[in-house]
């Protein structure tokens, strides 16, 4: 039957008639090819593609018929459709400028098949082949933005944050031009994930936290974004930016619903965190967040050591490297190195006396510390009052009336 389709196509290519009549006859042949099955169907469809890209066929007809052809293929088995898509892209390549719209459609559909198969890299690379900026066709902003975001997301799924960042940067140039709110949200999610994968944790936390307030996002997804914001903040390097983010999250009552709230509370209140308190939190982290740093420690270990060092700087005026190492549960030399790095980067105030083996912490102002402690106490008292009100609303109402009457 494939041979019959090929013969019909050869006869039609040598015949004359109006575009409308010829297009109708080609559609009949396409329908006949679609009705076949197995190898016969595959060969017939390939023959149809070869006919469409032949220069003897009018470009008006071939573009129209290739568009129709693309609408039929999703109904075929994925294995057949994939082979036909690849064959079509190969045959169209010499005349790709003439069939840009059809090629873009084929690449989108082929990428969907690869995505379904969880072949993320091939899906991304197929979409990269769409000439969004260099082609003859003018693509609208939303189409380009959506495609770049899809490529970035696919590279993230393939654990390639470098390529993902390259395409999210291209999307960044377009997102201000788009009025599609859904695409704007997708951009923010993807950008936050790229920052997260690239270990730019404080920037990722800020983006995730921003998403957690977007009313267009479903409530469960907002809470998920808040959870990611909290995890990224805990993993971020100690310093002023992280302290500000910890304060923002600690004041957000929604964080009390999250499993990692206990760690957040300890970090915000500058308490020393012990290694055995981290096991439950470590199990919640995503694979890329469990990576090790250059010195062999995990990202979480490094973040907690820096936090504990900053907490120690608020407890002591000075401390020897040996004592500091014991406090941080790490070798003295490593404690010295981390303290030196934090002081050099301006993330901790102090200086190191290497002759005596002591790190000196510069005295902090008492007033801001008192303010922070009072603020924390008020916050906790407010939480207690809310819980009492929920448990015993009638008693709370009577107590309030009695207070007002005094």
Swiss-Prot record:
Q: Which organism is it from?
A: Rattus norvegicus
Broad class of where this protein is predominantly found? cytoplasm
> Membrane-spanning residues where?
none
Task: Indicate the segments annotated as coiled coil, or none if absent.
Answer: none
Q: What cellular component terms from Gene Ontology apply here?
A: COP9 signalosome; cytoplasm; nuclear speck; nucleus; synaptic vesicle
InterPro entries, per database record: CSN4_HTH, PCI_dom, PSMD12-CSN4-like_N, PSMD12/CSN4, WH-like_DNA-bd_sf, WH_DNA-bd_sf
Q: Write the protein's name.
A: COP9 signalosome complex subunit 4
Where does the record place the PCI domain? Answer: 197-366
Record keywords = Acetylation, Cytoplasm, Cytoplasmic vesicle, Nucleus, Signalosome, Synapse
Q: Which residues are recorded as modified (N-acetylalanine)?
A: 2
Superkingdom field:
Eukaryota
User: GO annotations under biological process?
Assistant: protein deneddylation
The task this protein performs is described as: Component of the COP9 signalosome complex (CSN), a complex involved in various cellular and developmental processes. The CSN complex is an essential regulator of the ubiquitin (Ubl) conjugation pathway by mediating the deneddylation of the cullin subunits of SCF-type E3 ligase complexes, leading to decrease the Ubl ligase activity of SCF-type complexes such as SCF, CSA or DDB2. Also involved in the deneddylation of non-cullin subunits such as STON2.
Q: Which family does it belong to?
A: Belongs to the CSN4 family.
Q: Which compartment or compartments is the protein found in?
A: Cytoplasm; Nucleus; Cytoplasmic vesicle, Secretory vesicle, Synaptic vesicle
Positions modified as N6-acetyllysine?
25
The record, for Pfam families, names: CSN4_RPN5_eIF3a, PCI, PSMD12-CSN4_N
Gene3D superfamilies per record: Winged helix-like DNA-binding domain superfamily/Winged helix DNA-binding domain
Subunit info here reads: Component of the CSN complex, composed of COPS1/GPS1, COPS2, COPS3, COPS4, COPS5, COPS6, COPS7 (COPS7A or COPS7B), COPS8 and COPS9. In the complex, it probably interacts directly with COPS1, COPS2, COPS3, COPS5, COPS6, COPS7 (COPS7A or COPS7B) and COPS8. Interacts with TOR1A; the interaction is direct and associates TOR1A and SNAPIN with the CSN complex. Interacts with STON2; controls STON2 neddylation levels. Interacts with ERCC6.
């Amino acid at each position: 039957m494939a041979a019959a389709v090929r013969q019909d196509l050869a006869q039609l290519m040598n015949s004359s008639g109006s575009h409308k009549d010829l297009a109708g006859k080609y559609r009949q042949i396409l329908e006949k090819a679609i009705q076949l099955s197995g190898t016969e169907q595959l060969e017939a469809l390939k023959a149809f593609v070869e006919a469409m890209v032949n220069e003897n066929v009018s470009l008006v007809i071939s573009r129209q018929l290739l568009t129709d052809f693309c609408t039929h293929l999703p109904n075929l088995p994925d294995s057949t459709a994939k082979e036909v898509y690849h064959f079509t892209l190969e045959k169209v390549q010499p005349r790709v400028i003439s069939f840009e719209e059809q090629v873009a459609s084929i690449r989108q559909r082929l990428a969907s098949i690869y995505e379904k198969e969880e072949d993320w890299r091939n899906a991304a690379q197929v979409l990269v082949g769409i000439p969004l900026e260099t082609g003859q066709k003018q693509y609208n902003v939303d189409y380009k933005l959506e495609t770049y975001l899809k490529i970035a997301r696919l590279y993230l799924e393939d654990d390639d944050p470098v390529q993902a960042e390259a395409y999210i940067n291209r999307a960044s140039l377009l997102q201000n031009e788009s009025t599609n709110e859904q695409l704007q949200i997708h951009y923010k999610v993807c950008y936050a994930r790229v920052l997260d994968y690239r270990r730019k944790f404080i920037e990722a936390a800020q983006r995730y936290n921003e998403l957690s307030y977007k009313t267009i996002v479903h409530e469960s997804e907002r809470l998920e974004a808040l959870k990611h914001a909290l995890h990224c903040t805990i993993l971020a390097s100690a310093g002023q930016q992280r302290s500000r983010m910890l304060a923002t999250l600690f004041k957000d009552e929604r964080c009390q619903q999250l499993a990692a709230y206990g760690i957040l509370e300890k970090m915000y209140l500058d308490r020393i965190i012990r290694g055995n308190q981290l096991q439950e939190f470590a199990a919640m982290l995503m694979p890329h967040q469990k990576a090790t740093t250059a010195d062999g420690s995990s990202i979480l270990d490094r973040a907690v050591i820096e936090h504990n060092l900053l907490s120690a700087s608020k407890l002591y005026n000075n401390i020897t490297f040996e004592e500091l190492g014991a406090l941080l549960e790490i070798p003295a030399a490593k404690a010295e190195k981390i303290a030196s790095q934090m002081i050099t980067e301006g993330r901790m105030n102090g200086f190191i006396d290497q002759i005596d083996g002591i790190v000196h912490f510069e005295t902090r102002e008492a007033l801001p510390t008192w303010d922070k402690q009072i603020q924390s106490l008020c916050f906790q008292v407010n939480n207690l009052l809310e819980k009492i009100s929920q448990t015993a609303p009638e008693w709370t109402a009577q107590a309030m009336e009695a207070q007002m009457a005094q």
